[in-house]
A protein has these predicted regions:
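Hydrophobic transmembrane alpha-helices and their membrane-interface caps
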Residues: 26-32, 37, 340-407, 465
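Helix-loop junctions and hydrophobic alpha-helical segments within the transmembrane domains
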Residues: 317, 324, 328, 403, ...
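Surface-exposed amphipathic alpha-helical segments in non-transmembrane regions
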Residues: 16, 23-32, 63-80, 95-179, ...
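Interfacial segments of transmembrane alpha-helices in multi-pass membrane proteins
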Residues: 2, 6-16, 286-289, 325-381, ...
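Signature of alpha-helical transmembrane segments and their immediate interfacial
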Residues: 1-35, 427, 496-554
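Hydrophobic, glycine/alanine-rich multi-pass transmembrane helices and their short helix-loop junctions
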Residues: 344-349, 368-383, 432-484, 544, ...
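Juxtamembrane "pre-transmembrane" interface segments
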Residues: 152, 172-176, 184, 255-257, ...
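Transmembrane helices with small-residue packing motifs
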Residues: 20-56, 114-123, 378, 446-455, ...
Length: 659
C-alpha cells in the first residue's frame, strides 16, 4: 500500500493531469446532464380507459367495467386492480407485482383488452398505458374579457405555438370545454321528408371522411390521390346532401336540422383573479430539460404579450422549476462558503499551500461524482442535489486529515516527498475505515422497495460517489500536490497583521491542546469505564427522549410552500352549481384568512388565484365531471410574509368549516 502511495506522490505531472481530467469531465458532464425537479420513474401501475359518450355510470358499469374485469382475470404479474364507472368513461388502475416486468404485463393487458369484442358499439377504442410520474414544468393562464369561443381559439393557438418551440413536446390545454357540433332534428321534419334518423346519421358519417384514392404512376412522377371530405364546422355540415327527391331536388342537412357549432355540455368553468381563463400546462419528457423548457416558455411569453389584445392577459401561473433553481443556488452558495471556510481555517492554523489543495477536495469530489452520475444516465434533480448538499461538509474531512498529517511530518524536518508519503501512510487506513463506514451506512437506501425506494434511489449513489472520489483524491492526488512543501523550520515569520493573526491563532491552539485537551484525554483514558458508561447513558437518554415524544420526529418536515390548493370532490351526479358553490366558499374563506396577514405595506400575501369547476387540476390525467372543483392560491415568497403556509391551511379549514 505504501509503495502505491509513494508512486502517486512522486508523480506530480500525472496527478495534475488526473486533476484536470476530473474537473473538465465534471464540468462537461454537468453541462450535458438533464435538470428536472424530481426523477421520473415507473410507479408499477397500468391505466385502462375506455370512453363511452352519453352513457351513465350504470351503463358504463355493465358495458365497460365488467368486460375489463373479465379480461384482466388470469394475467400473470398483476397484484390487484381497481375499476371505476363514471359518466362517459370506464377505467381501471392495475397494480403490477413488485419484481415483475411492467412492459411484459403491459403487453399482456393490451392484448387482452384489445381482444374484447363485446364493448358497446358507441364505445371508443380502449387506451392502455403505463403510469409514470409525469411532472409539469410550467402552467400558463390566458384570461381576459372575451367570449368562450375566442378564448378557446386563442388558447389552442398558443398551445400549438408553445409545442413548436425547441425542446418542448408535451403541452396540454385544460379549463376550457371541447368543441362540439350538435345536430337537432324534430320528428316533424323527419316525417315531412320521409327519412329516418339513422339515414341522416349515415349521410353525415359517409360525407365527412378523408379517403385515400390510390396512386397514379407516370413516367415522370407518382401522384397520390386523396379525397378530402371531412367537415369541421357547422356551415360545412349544413351542405351535406341527405336526400334527393323524385323531382331532382337536393335536401341538405341544413334544410331539415338545426346545427349548433359550439361546445360540449360539460360544465367546465375556470377563472384567474375573477376573469374567465384557460390554462396551458407544459410537461417534460425523460429526454427534456426542465430549466430549458421553463426559460423557453418565459421568452415566448415576453415576446407574445405585446402581440395580444390589451384586455387579454397571458401570465405564468406556476413555475415548476422554482424549487429546483433554489436548490441549485443553495448548493452553489454552500460550496463557495465551504471552500472559503476550509481555505481560511487551514491557512490560519497551518499553511497557505495546504489550505488551497485541501480546499480543492470539494470541487474535485463534486466533479468526479457529476461524471459518475452522467455516465449512469442520471439527472440533476431535487434528490441528487440534496445528496450533494448533505455530503458537502464531509468530502473535505479526509483531505484535511491527510494534509495535517503531511504538514506535521514536514515540520519534523523530513524531505518533502518523504513527509508526503509518511504522512498519508500514517492515516490511510483510519481514513479508509472512516469513509467506508459512511458509505456502508448509505448502502441500505439502495434496497428500499416500492415507490419511495425508486424516489430516493439516486441519493446513496450521489453520496457514495462523492465520498469515493474524495477518498481517492486525498490518498493519491493530494500527497503529490503537497510533496513540495517548503521547510517549515526555515520559514521566516512575516510582519503583516495577517501573519500576526496566524501566529496568534496557532499559539492559542497549541495552548488549548497542551493545557486542556491532553489533560482531559489522559483523564478519559485513566477513568475509561466511567467515561464509557457516561457515553452509553447519553445515548440511551437521547433515544428515550425521542421514544417518549419529548423530542419530536418527522420523516418529512412540513416546509413553507408558496402554493396552496384546496380540492372538492362530491359524489358523481352532483350538479355543477353545488360544486361551484363549494369552490366559491373555499375561495372567499381563504381571501378572508389572507386579509388578516397582509404585509407591513398592506400588500396581500396572495399573488394569484385560480378557480376551476368541472375538471380537476392536472389537465387530461386529472379527470372531468361536474362533481370536481379546485381553488388554488400562489403566495408571496416566504421571506416576504410573516405567516407559514401550514398555519394558513389550518386557518382555512377553520374558516371554511365542513363543506
Amino acid at each position: 500500500m505504501k509503495k502505491l502511495l509513494a508512486a502517486f506522490a512522486a508523480n506530480t505531472v500525472f496527478a495534475n493531469i488526473i486533476l484536470i481530467l476530473i474537473l473538465v469531465g465534471g464540468g462537461l458532464s454537468l453541462s450535458y446532464m438533464l435538470r428536472e425537479t424530481f426523477p421520473e420513474f415507473s410507479v408499477d401501475k397500468i391505466s385502462i380507459r375506455v370512453a363511452y359518450p352519453g352513457a351513465d355510470p350504470e351503463e358504463v358499469e355493465e358495458g365497460i367495467v365488467l368486460k375489463i374485469e373479465e379480461a384482466l382475470e388470469g394475467i400473470e404479474g398483476i397484484k390487484e386492480y381497481t375499476t371505476t364507472a363514471a359518466e362517459n368513461m370506464g377505467s381501471a388502475m392495475v397494480d403490477v407485482l413488485e419484481g415483475s416486468d411492467v412492459s411484459e404485463v403491459l403487453d399482456d393487458v393490451k392484448s387482452k383488452i384489445d381482444a374484447v369484442s363485446t364493448f358497446p358499439v358507441d364505445a371508443e377504442k380502449p387506451v392502455v398505458t403505463e403510469v409514470t410520474m409525469r411532472r409539469s414544468v410550467s402552467m400558463l393562464s390566458l384570461s381576459g374579457k372575451m367570449s368562450e369561443k375566442q378564448l378557446k381559439v386563442l388558447a389552442e393557438q398558443l398551445k400549438e405555438e408553445i409545442r413548436a418551440l425547441d425542446g418542448i413536446s408535451q403541452v396540454e390545454l385544460f379549463g376550457a370545454r371541447d368543441y362540439e357540433i350538435s345536430i337537432e332534428i324534430s320528428e316533424e321534419q323527419l316525417r315531412r321528408y320521409g327519412i329516418s334518423l339513422a339515414q341522416v346519421a349515415e349521410a353525415v358519417r359517409s360525407s365527412s371522411l378523408n379517403l385515400h384514392g390510390g396512386t397514379i404512376r407516370t413516367q415522370g412522377e407518382e401522384i397520390r390521390v386523396r379525397t378530402v371530405g371531412r367537415k369541421y364546422t357547422g356551415k360545412e355540415l349544413a351542405e351535406i346532401v341527405v336526400l334527393a327527391n323524385s323531382a331532382g331536388e337536393l335536401i341538405k342537412l341544413g334544410d331539415l336540422a338545426t346545427i349548433r357549432d359550439g361546445f360540449v355540455e360539460d360544465p367546465i368553468s375556470s377563472e384567474v383573479d375573477g376573469d374567465a381563463a384557460a390554462f396551458i400546462m407544459v410537461f417534460k419528457t425523460s429526454e427534456e430539460d426542465s430549466i430549458h423548457i421553463a426559460d423557453t416558455v418565459k421568452k415566448y411569453m415576453a415576446a407574445k404579450q405585446g402581440q395580444l389584445p390589451p384586455d387579454v392577459h397571458l401570465q405564468e401561473f406556476y413555475d415548476g422549476t422554482k424549487e429546483l433553481r433554489s436548490r441549485i443556488s443553495l448548493l452553489t452558495k454552500n460550496g463557495y462558503m465551504g471552500l472559503a471556510l476550509v481555505f481560511f481555517l487551514l491557512w490560519l492554523f497551518l499553511d497557505l499551500r495546504l489550505s488551497f489543495w485541501a480546499g480543492m477536495g470539494i470541487p474535485i469530489s463534486l466533479s468526479g461524482a457529476m461524471f459518475i452520475l452522467w455516465w449512469m444516465g442520471e439527472t440533476l434533480n431535487m434528490i441528487s442535489l440534496f445528496g450533494f448538499i448533505m455530503v458537502l461538509g464531509i468530502v473535505v474531512d479526509d483531505a484535511i486529515v491527510v494534509g495535517e498529517s503531511i504538514y506535521f511530518h514536514r515540520s519534523l524536518g523530513k524531505p518533502p516527498l518523504k513527509a508526503a508519503v509518511d504522512g498519508v501512510a500514517e492515516v490511510a487506513m483510519p481514513i479508509v475505515a472512516a469513509v467506508s463506514t459512511t458509505i456502508v451506512a448509505f448502502v441500505p437506501l439502495s434496497f428500499i422497495g416500492g415507490i419511495m425506494g425508486k424516489f430516493i434511489s439516486i441519493l446513496p449513489v450521489v453520496v457514495n460517489a462523492s465520498l469515493f472520489v474524495s477518498l481517492w483524491e486525498s490518498l493519491f492526488l493530494l500527497p503529490a500536490h503537497l510533496s513540495h512543501l517548503p521547510d517549515l523550520r526555515k520559514r521566516k515569520p512575516g510582519r503583516s497583521p495577517l501573519s500576526w493573526l496566524q501566529r496568534g491563532t496557532q499559539a492559542a491552539l497549541e495552548w488549548f491542546i497542551s493545557r486542556i485537551y491532553v489533560p482531559f484525554l489522559a483523564a478519559a483514558i485513566q477513568w475509561r469505564y466511567i467515561f464509557l458508561a457516561f457515553s452509553i447513558s447519553s445515548l440511551l437518554l437521547a433515544v428515550g427522549l425521542v421514544q417518549a415524544g419529548l423530542v419530536k420526529f418527522q420523516v418529512f418536515p412540513k416546509l413553507d410552500s408558496f402554493l396552496i390548493t384546496s380540492t372538492v370532490e362530491f359524489p358523481e351526479g352532483t350538479p355543477a352549481a353545488v360544486t361551484k358553490q363549494a369552490v366559491d366558499r373555499l375561495e372567499q374563506a381563504f381571501l378572508k384568512v389572507a386579509e388578516g396577514h397582509n404585509t407591513a405595506e398592506g400588500k396581500s400575501i396572495i399573488e394569484k388565484r385560480l378557480k376551476l369547476v368541472g375538471q380537476s387540476m392536472g389537465g387530461e390525467q386529472g379527470g372531468n365531471g361536474p362533481h370536481l372543483g379546485s381553488v388554488q392560491f400562489i403566495l408571496l415568497p416566504s421571506e416576504e410574509r410573516s405567516v407559514h403556509s401550514n398555519d394558513l391551511l389550518v386557518a382555512l379549514e377553520q374558516e371554511a368549516g365542513t363543506i
